[in-house]
């Protein structure tokens, strides 16, 4: 192990393959090597090299995020936002001309159009991000990422097998948690399940984009990358703690055959983008649609079901004020912030739609400062995933009590991290 830099099982596998190659080279007069394999070997010298693999991977991710959040995705999102605003104004004028009841008009314009529309504008960003990720997957590069990350993951108690569910976690936590079933070791599988929610899912992109556009417009990509890296860093710390305490032991061996590099299939990329867009639209017009209506109702009526002129007198404000003091050390003790985080438990996109409904057209900086916005972003990054992901964790662990404990732990980690960020920015 000391000589090869590999663990015992990997070293044995390497010796077997070396022996097989020596036998083949001595027996076969002329071994034909395909052009694709020769090209892949040359590319792997750079992409999986000992000193170049990690810098290249970080460079590729940096370029992907820059193109998504600062160039292509953001511009498309801005254009769509103009269209959504124009459509909302058109609906408003039409309902006013028709003389519809003001309460119903408020539901349609201030509730549904503002809430669902505020989430829809982030569809281009999500599609752009998955366009680049699907290309990386289809070329065979992501398989190299699993191979490259095996050694670093072993230092925190996991193997390269865990990287696949974690990478899926950047899309959605539900299939990522289900993908841990491919991890043979029960110890590794449970550790991976607990770490996967720290990989920021695509549903949170709308929150990040919403806040970075308002508070950090000139550093969008940098803030986005920082959030993703912070989630990974917290996951590493959590893995080290679990490896030293709850999940003592060694990770399972990891051996895989790397496929040749190939040009991405336009059909497979298009199918993946269609699936992501369809899933996003289904959530926008089902879960988020219903959540928006519920939020509008709670912020429009008081406890006696009378229409309120000021949402501060509403049912929603009453609920939010019970919880808001918990977030005072984080810089956002406003009841509207608390209720948006509660709605985020249903679906993370609901955080944006809830804030949009509660703001009533007012700018976001009336509720947040740059400092509290950064703290809020860190909290949304780390606190418990959506209810669908929690239900999946419950099914995989087979215990409601353990699931409740996991949710509370995630909320505590998020609260501590956000309070530290808020305090550090205050000092700086």
Roles of regions detected by a PLM:
Residues 1-32:
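Alpha-helical transmembrane helix bundles of large polytopic membrane transport and channel proteins
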Residues 202-225, 388-399, 418-428:
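Transmembrane helix-loop junctions at the membrane interface of multipass transporters and ion channels
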Residues 116-142, 149-175, 322-359:
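Hydrophobic alpha-helical transmembrane segments of multi-pass integral membrane proteins
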Residues 9, 27-40, 84, 94-105, ...:
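Short, membrane-interfacial amphipathic segments enriched in basic
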Residues 47-147:
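Core alpha-helical transmembrane segments of integral membrane proteins
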Residues 71-112, 156, 177-189, 293-411:
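Extended, low-charge hydrophobic alpha-helical regions
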Residues 32, 82, 86-90, 143-173, ...:
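Juxtamembrane inter-helical linkers in multi-pass membrane proteins
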Residues 56-67, 129-134, 212-214, 227-242, ...:
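Hydrophobic core segments of alpha-helical transmembrane domains in multi-pass membrane transport
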């Amino acid at each position: 192990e000391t000589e090869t830099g590999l663990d015992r099982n990997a070293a044995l596998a390497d010796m077997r393959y070396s022996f097989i190659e020596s036998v083949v080279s001595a027996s076969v007069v002329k071994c034909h090597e395909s052009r694709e394999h020769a090209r892949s070997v040359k590319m792997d010298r750079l992409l999986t090299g000992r000193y170049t693999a990690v810098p290249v991977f970080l460079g590729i991710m940096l370029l992907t995020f820059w193109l998504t959040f600062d160039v292509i995705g953001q511009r498309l999102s801005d254009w769509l936002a103009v269209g959504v605003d124009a459509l909302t104004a058109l609906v408003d004028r039409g309902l006013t001309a028709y003389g519809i009841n003001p309460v119903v008009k408020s539901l349609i314009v201030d509730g549904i159009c503002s809430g669902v529309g505020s989430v829809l504008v982030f569809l281009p960003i999500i599609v752009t991000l998955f366009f680049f990720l699907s290309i990386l997957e289809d070329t065979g590069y992501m398989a190299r990422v699993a191979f490259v990350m095996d050694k670093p993951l072993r230092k925190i108690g996991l193997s390269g097998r865990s990287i696949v569910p974690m990478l899926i976690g950047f899309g959605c936590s539900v299939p990522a948690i289900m993908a841990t079933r491919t991890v043979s070791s029960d110890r590794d599988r449970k550790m991976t399940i607990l770490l996967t929610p720290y990989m920021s899912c695509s549903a949170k992109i709308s929150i990040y984009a919403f806040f970075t556009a308002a508070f950090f417009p000139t550093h969008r990509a940098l803030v986005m990358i920082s959030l993703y890296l912070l989630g990974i860093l917290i996951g590493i710390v959590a893995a080290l703690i679990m490896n030293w305490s709850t999940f003592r032991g060694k990770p399972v061996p990891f051996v895989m055959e790397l496929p040749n590099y190939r040009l991405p299939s336009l059909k497979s990329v298009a199918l993946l983008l269609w699936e992501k867009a369809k899933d996003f639209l289904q959530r926008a017009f089902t879960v988020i649609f219903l959540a928006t209506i519920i939020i509008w109702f709670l912020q429009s009526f008081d406890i006696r079901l009378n229409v309120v002129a000021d949402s501060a007198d509403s049912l929603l404000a009453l609920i939010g004020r019970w919880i808001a003091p918990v977030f005072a050390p984080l810089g956002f003790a406003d009841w509207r912030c608390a209720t948006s985080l509660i709605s985020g438990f249903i679906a993370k996109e609901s955080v944006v739609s809830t804030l949009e409904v509660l703001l009533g057209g007012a700018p976001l900086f009336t509720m947040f400062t740059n400092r509290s916005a950064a703290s809020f972003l860190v909290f949304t990054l780390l606190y418990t995933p959506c209810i669908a992901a929690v239900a999946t964790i419950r099914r995989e662990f087979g215990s409601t009590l353990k699931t409740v404990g996991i949710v509370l732990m995630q909320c505590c980690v998020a609260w501590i991290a956000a309070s530290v960020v808020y305090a550090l920015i205050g000092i700086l």
